[in-house]
């Protein structure tokens, strides 16, 4: 009988515990491997330096201030459970819930056309406005300490993680959001990792290029190389307790936006009243039981949808190699044949993207 796991952290630990021979082999590499590792060390150090240059971190919120904001986050969760938010405000997944305010955007299975760069903002009014407490308790403090300018934020997302949850390697869509990307952490300490590779079945996460501890009440600002040229993620082993992060961003004025007629949902908030509104705005729930291998995955791997945004169309006869999609866009000039663009009967090129769904 196969073992069962409550979350991904246990499964990651079991992989190393159950495979001592493999561990010993890694501890005793061949001379060729040692030479390759020695040669790559300067490159890794240089990349880590570039990542570090694009990160600003400051501790702004005291424990008392954190507790007050965390109570407000709990209120958001409660309102979502009661179905008091608009349909596209809440996005649920096992071990991770997202709450979009101000601006929301499509991704994964929500996309009409799958692939990098296909994300679209929802029409205005499709998600709820940024709560007053976010402006008063969070954004105002950031403006006062000159972390962001006045009027910068028009999109606020609350990611609420349970122990063992995570988000795979990704780059925030450059065609949707301006830089910097600002996040504020609550409930517990965690870490942000850069340049990790996620592998599934079995679940594995590679060592990061750069590991950034993130404390409760701290503000993390990403720009430059850290925001655009390398992926970031939250690993399951780094979420030991419940953790929430408030992500504050500004959408680009030229960011593509869905038209009302293209939405999968046909409801219009201004026409809803009384029981009709309550009926349509019910909480969104996953219809699939939590799976240790898939619990933390969004509808499409963000590493696929974000990092391949710079991919080029390849001839039909070229096939995808064994290279991982992780970090593909950063080295596309070296491995241009790692992805194949194959058409249907008409032979037209179509971007091939690895899909994973709930």
Curated annotation (Swiss-Prot):
Its main location: nucleus. GO terms for molecular function: 2-oxoglutarate-dependent dioxygenase activity; metal ion binding; molecular condensate scaffold activity; mRNA N6-methyladenosine dioxygenase activity. Residues 7-22, 289-310 have a biased composition (Basic and acidic residues). Residues 1-50, 259-312, 334-358 are annotated as: Disordered. Its EC number is 1.14.11.53. 2-oxoglutarate binds at residues 159, 161, 170, 232, 243. Keywords: Dioxygenase, Disulfide bond, Iron, Metal-binding, Nucleus, Oxidoreductase. It is found in: Nucleus speckle. This is RNA demethylase ALKBH5.
